[in-house]
UniProtKB/Swiss-Prot annotation:
Keywords in alphabetical order: Glutamine amidotransferase, Stress response, Transferase
PANTHER family hit by this protein: GLUTAMINE AMIDOTRANSFERASE GAT1_2.1-RELATED (PTHR43235:SF8), GLUTAMINE AMIDOTRANSFERASE PB2B2.05-RELATED (PTHR43235)
Classification lineage: Eukaryota, Viridiplantae, Streptophyta, Embryophyta, Tracheophyta
PROSITE patterns per UniProt: GATASE_TYPE_1
Organism: Arabidopsis thaliana
Protein name: Putative glutamine amidotransferase GAT1_2.1
Induction: Induced by phosphate starvation. Highly repressed following nitrogen deprivation.
Pfam families (UniProt xref): Peptidase_C26
CDD domains, A to Z: GATase1_2 (cd01745)
Top-level taxon in the UniProt lineage: Eukaryota
Length: 395
């Protein structure tokens, strides 16, 4: 856990969390569970809430920089986003029963789907750390090309072993068994092969996206956790994990103490990856800025020797003076060019007769100057400067 005093002098990494919408006093209200926020803050990151507002999916670039994304609970994911290539065995009668049993959860929120799928795909493309809890894990699977059961009881309930994945009368107290796969991150975090997990969902992973590997199963065979083995190294800023259960709610009755230390460790490892990712991004930005600065300095009168906080030699000081002279000369040159252009415009306005008179005058002045120079060259004091004077004659 990060001490608050240590955070005041740092710019902390940002973790985006999409809010959920509910109806209160005849008005929609957005909210995010404080359990998630507390765990993110105590682990050393800043939660940035993305409001579930119409049109926000097209404004997500304005939330940059994004160092991590946490997606959590919410309504069912729209089946049209993943079920196009698989025929459902659910009949119209089945769908009616499901709606009656899970009326609130089956209210599709397409704006939230759009926001969260966009963020999940962004994380997949840019290797941004991602943690998906409950619905968030389903979004991650769909974003990567996987599919979902529209209703576990109807589609998976025919197996020999059944599991109660939801208890509307006992949200926090409900538990069911989950068997952890050995040598997976979840096994290392919980140090157990079997744990009792809290969950409330009627959908779940049907076909796991190819890039993911299961970390835990319910007794009925439903995947309770998965990760990308090629994208999991928190110290290096890599974290891509989905958990169907709720580690943030797995607490002892009447206490804030977790059922297992691994519940908080999930968030701590996630934020560890977020911090490492931010550091990499900052370093990459600094390298790019240094590269651009070096290019600029090199292009400025070939001043490769310029480095910050370096004592300059006499030669380097002279080169700096030359650079200054170059800048001054270039300014004079530009002024002369401007004057020349103005003079040319003025000459264009003169008549041919006037221009002819001016040309004759300049030829006469040239002859007079030439004769004067020849006379001076014949004088004794100028005999040792013949070579220099010949230059002017030729000119």
């Amino acid at each position: 856990m990060v001490v608050a005093n240590d955070l005041s002098s740092k710019i902390l990494p940002r973790v985006l969390i999409v809010s959920r919408r509910t109806l209160r006093k005849n008005k929609y209200v957005d909210f995010v569970g404080e359990y998630h926020l507390d765990l993110i803050v105590s682990s050393g990151a800043v939660p940035v809430i993305v409001p579930r507002v119409n049109g926000i999916h097209s404004m997500l670039q304005s939330f940059e920089p994004i160092h991590g994304v946490l997606l959590c609970e919410g309504e069912d994911v729209d089946p049209s986003l993943y079920a196009d290539d698989e025929l459902s065995d659910l009949s119209p009668e089945d769908m009616e029963e499901i709606k009656k049993a899970h009326a609130e959860d089956m209210t599709i929120d397409r704006e939230k789907d759009s926001i969260e799928l966009t963020l999940a795909r962004l994380c997949l493309e840019r290797n941004i750390p991602f943690l998906g809890i409950c619905r968030g894990s389903q979004i991650l699977n769909v974003a990567a090309g996987g599919t979902l059961y529209q209703d576990i009881d109807k589609e998976l309930g025919t197996t020999m072993t059944t599991t109660n994945h939801i208890d509307y009368d006992n949200y926090d107290g409900h538990r069911h068994e989950a068997r952890i796969v050995e040598e997976t991150p979840l096994h290392k975090l919980f140090e157990e092969m079997e744990i009792m997990v809290n969950s409330y969902h009627h959908q779940g992973v049907k076909r796991l996206a190819q890039r993911f590997v299961p970390m835990a199963y319910a007794p009925d065979g439903l995947i309770e956790g998965f990760y990308d083995p090629n994208r999991y190294d928190p110290k290096e800023g890599q974290f891509l994990m989905g958990l169907q259960f709720h580690p943030e709610r797995m607490r002892l009755p009447g206490s804030d103490e977790f059922d297992y230390p691994g519940c908080a460790l999930v968030y701590q490892e996630f934020v560890k990856a977020v911090i490492a990712f931010q550091k990499k991004q900052v370093n990459a930005t600094q390298v790019e800025m240094k590269r651009k600065t070096t290019t600029l300095v090199k292009s400025f009168s070939q001043a490769e020797f310029l480095e910050a906080n370096t004592v300059l030699s006499k030669q380097q000081e002279n080169r700096l003076k030359q650079m200054g002279a170059t800048v001054r000369n270039s300014c004079v040159y530009m002024k002369r060019m401007k004057m020349k252009e103005e003079q040319e415009r003025a000459m264009d306005k003169l008549s041919a007769e006037r221009l002819s008179d001016m040309l004759s005058f300049h030829h006469m002045m040239a002859r007079l100057c030439s004769n004067a120079i020849k006379r001076k060259l014949l004088e004794p004091e100028h005999t040792d400067r013949t070579i220099e004077s010949s230059f002017f004659l030729n000119y």
